């Protein structure tokens, strides 16, 4: 069955917000600018201000061409927002263009820092170490909060999310089809070590007609009880429709492919927290192992070679070892004062965390850091001295606030962080 959201339960199944009765009740009451009980546009944005400058069309936005393939992705170019909106109005389109991975929130902060955000992250997804980390580094002008705008027929190839993070996707309008594979099922699809670019044909699921939607579920049937389909080749997968106003949650390690069945606007976040930081740790270390194998023919164990490994890891994985340790230390430092009772700690977009929540976060940070710092691949990474000293200090501070013997950290056999033995 689909688990409720909990800091102490690892989320194992994808779900759509309409699976939860309170979301269904709120959805019936809500209007077009509300999302599962959470208003996407603030009162001031919706009613009292002129159209934000960010919507006027002069910004450059990333646009993918879904009609072409470039290695294992779709080629991208930059257009003005107004050019893409004009494209959407065309009746005879030559290519299928998809505005995707637009750092909308970062763009708004840069262009209109005094304005309130256009939307607020739902509280279920507000424990977000990844975006908290990037929010405190505005000079990077980066984050993992995206807006997607696509005409009917646009799609995203088969993939798993960056860093093996969680992701959530909220349909402001439109309709999406999702095919999702439980972890490990994707291995049945590998050919010469490669995964398929487009999974629908491989699964024999070209038509969306058999996909499950909240609009077509019989009365009394819960989405939490849905069972996966099985392809002719024995691959288990879920095939679901996401309607306007619904939120899709995708757990770590679930490969998926997504199509826009109608013109669609969605808000999408990738995020890490205590529940999946072990997946992220394991994937980072596996990616580093793969990088070292690629550079094995020039391996000499020198500092220069180790630096090359980290540079390639950053280029292919999106994050190197030092940055990951810094993220963990950042998350811990923010939570230590709150766990001591000295100050309230707020997550993404102002949501406040409980004391128990903070202690759980700290316990997981301690566990992952302790294991990482025991690995030579981490301690011998270049430019790590200051970072390692900070990590040791964080571990000591956490053990002072959350002593393991007092239940502040998982004991033997209790940790499922992904890097513990």
Spans of model-derived segments:
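N-terminal accessory scaffold of Fe(II)-dependent oxygenases
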Residues: 1-247, 259-421
